[in-house]
Each structure stands twice: as structure tokens, then as C-alpha cells.
């Protein structure tokens, strides 16, 4: 964890099967706050990073020392670290483990549930969704991301039995949990190593379904293309059929391709796809020049990733080419004349 040696040598607690620093020691908090400052200077806004979970405190960096609850940093010390994150990161979202109006709820933070489907939905205060609601943080998802990790003991049962919807051992209804929390991302290491699953191909299909239920699901619900004085007037509407918005600025591009599929022009619009809430829509329009050569052309839409090698946003419409270009119109320049 990068804790200085002198903090190990002068710690309060003895060795067991692991080394645990004294989280109440202000010297440790000083070190962690200094780390966060430099961490933000180097990585805030780095397009390779989607979100950062705050970590640093408690077992596995999950902000608890269960079952030794008296060993956790005080609320004041926790607030110092959250304040350091809030100061150091303006662009990259930071996520906290627990929703709490006395600490994490005071800052521009998202949240992550690392016992997803196990302690996500319930009436008592131990459940993640209940904590969001009781601390009046259940609308945070509209501006800041929610995510987590499927409870480790639930991962193989879900993949084996394909009971993500009905609930498996240790698991609540996964899709209900996603819908209620508006989760955008989820960790599930078993979906990658597949160790212990009965049917790997079925497990992969199940994992794909779990993944596709998260976050935004953008579809082009309306489109209109008109020719006027050598220009193409293009308008379209994007609807979010998912459970959460997009949290980064991504911009749609209008692509004109010839009959052989070669791209002859690509125009990125200045209007972002960010922030379209579930079941809401946003309209876009632009005007571009007709291609110079005669022939048949296709008008398509997609949203390129600003990161080199990154995957674009692909609209969920079926009429796509190359798996990413959503076709909205075709035209023949001879007929336009």
C-alpha cells in the first residue's frame, strides 16, 4: 500500500496473518493525503482511466476493519482523505465504498458496492441501496457513477446456473440490483478465468448478459436526412434505454460512405452524449456538404473513442455496418440532381 517503513515499525497493533497499520494514526493519514495530491496531479483526466475507487483505508482498501471496527480511522480522518480526493481530482470520478452523509456524502463522489447481489437490496441499514436512500444519496447516479463487484461467493453459482435473474446461492436478483442502483460497471473475475463453471460457453453468454445490462444503452430513435442546395441537412434523436447516463463527454460523428464501404467524410458534432438519463432523449442536427463524386452513398452514425485504440460508442440499432456504424439513410447523387 506504499505505507512508509517508520509507520510499520511504530504501529499500535501486533502481527497476525497480515500487517495492519494503525488507521487512527494521523501520520498515516498525512501520508495518504499527500499520496492523493500527487496521484491527482499525475492522473486526473487521464483518458485511460474511467473511474477510481478511493481505497487506501481498511481491509482491501474497502473502508472497514471488520470485525475489529474500533481500528478504523475516525470520521474526521476519513473526511480528510475524501477532501484530498475532492481537491486533487476534477475530471476523473472518484468512488467511495460506503454512502454516508457524515463523510463520503459531503463530496462529489460516486459509490461502489463490493458485495453486489449479496448485500445490495434490503430493509436494514447494512444494505447498499438502503444506505444510499437513508443518506439521501440515491440520486447521485444521475451525475456520478455507481458500480462494484459481484459478491465472490455468488459469481460461480450465477455463471453455472444462469440464475442471475432469479437469484442463485448468496445472490439477489442481479438485474433488479442493477436497475435499482443504476450501476454502470461491475467486477466479476470469475467471468474471465471461468474456473469452476460447468459450461464455459453458457457462462460466457451469461456474463455477456450481465455486462450488457449495465450503464447506458443508446439507440437512434429518430432520424431525418434532407438535401438542400448542395448540402445534407441531418437530424437525429438518441434515446437512452439503459439504467444510467454516460459520465464522460463523447460526441457523435456523421459518416458518409460510398457503395464500396469506403468512408468519404466524417463530421464530429459539437454536442455531447453525456448525461442522457434513462428513458430520456436528446436531439442532434448538423449540415454537411454533399460528396463530390456521383454515386450511391450511406449516412451512418457512431461515437469515436478519444483514446487511441479505445472502443467507440455503438448505438444499439440493428442496422449497422462493420459492427459500429448505425445506418440512418442512403442516397443517390444522380437522383438528387
Give, region by region, the residue ranges found by the protein language model.
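Extracellular/luminal regions of secreted and cell-surface proteins that mediate adhesion/ECM remodeling
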Residues: 208-337
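An active-site-proximal structural segment forming one wall of the substrate-binding cleft
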Residues: 1-2, 7-12, 16-53, 77-84, ...
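Hydrophobic/aromatic-rich, well-ordered segments within soluble, folded domains that form packed cores
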Residues: 47-57, 61, 232-239
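Catalytic cores of secreted or luminal carbohydrate-active enzymes
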Residues: 170-223
